């Protein structure tokens, strides 16, 4: 009962805050292109992103909160512990009003997300919910997937083109290294699109929210480094047959030993086949 009362108190305090656009205008807080910032003010959309993550984990980590639109939504939807990682010092000062309203449920860390071990923040289970800077979004995802066991889920916004690559299936035009490495470690699905005009300033592309849920264990047995290596070889020239791409390792004989047709092309193979190649590659490279 006490927890519900505290949630209601925080929700009311956040609802009583001035409109976000008004606060941003008064503070003359402008998005910085150098930081990949695009502010999202629409509470309907930020709430939709927050609800896509429910039920919330013990620790909700937000990367790059900006003026706090999504942060507000997380608190309004009942998140009990939000840790926001932000490198823009202007924003940290601007968000003091939200820290006060959150009544202990919100903590800010001034740090570069690329250098921050977010998998060590708060208490497990953790989840990351973020409108990511597009210029580092893929790098961050791959870094976090190396620590997938430390997370319950990721609800992340990407350029639509990147979202399609993350969620693509064998045979899809977008299927490639990012699809394989992500889905080897997690399930991934596109949840909904957000149009450019929802942001300030509007980007030139449509954005897509993706839900990524780490698997209890990887889809098939192999080392991550070996999987990265064989997918780099296979997709280096994606139109080539695998026997040509792996000529250095024995060509057709190498591919057949993994139980794969040497005439196959990489975009048609399931993840398990790449894992079989990775295991063979590991034996050769030892």
Model-identified regions with their sequence ranges:
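Catalytic cores of RNA-modifying enzymes
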Residues: 1-233, 276-282, 286
